[in-house]
Amino acid sequence: MAKQLSREQGITLRGSAEIVAEFFSYGINSILYQRGIYPSETFTRVQKYGLTLLVTTDPELKNYLNNVVEQLKDWLYKCLVQRLVVVISSIESSEVLERWQFDIECDRSAKDDGAPRERSQKAIQDEIRSVIRQITASVTFLPLLETTCAFDLLIYTDKDLAVPEKWEESGPQFIANSEEVRLRSFTTTIHKVSSMVAYRIPFLD
């Protein structure tokens, strides 16, 4: 019985991919809510990581994010994804105003039939909670978005990976004249996610 319990507490490659993909689902929703990209009334409260989080109820956005997360889960499992970026830009000028960057390191020696890694779910959730809290607190230091904005998701993968249908290749969409704030990281021991946000420095009149 003790052996079975130990296995349940360990982290497998597939389990790690699911944890990280789920983090991105909640993380992206949090960014879209906190930065006002979609109306606040199109979000609903859920409990996750010991926090009250907001997730979209917009059917189109929900479907889009679900598809992204499912694809991401597969790429994480195969250690093919290196970075995810949420780009926020002005609809009027197309200027990039914010760039939320999540760098992903994967231990390629991890195999699904290998022994689970020694890492408790609680320790991982504690680290993820810290990252989500920083996203939530970002409104205290990020400039107000004074124009209607849209978002893009960029996913950096291995170069030889075929681009799935409905996806397209994109440039990095950097910000001119920007500041960067590094956020916390978390690790499952198989995947490590480091995060930062870059934002355009407002011009002074």
Task: Describe the predicted segments one by one.
Residues 1-63, 71-205:
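Long protein-protein interaction modules used by eukaryotic assembly/scaffold proteins
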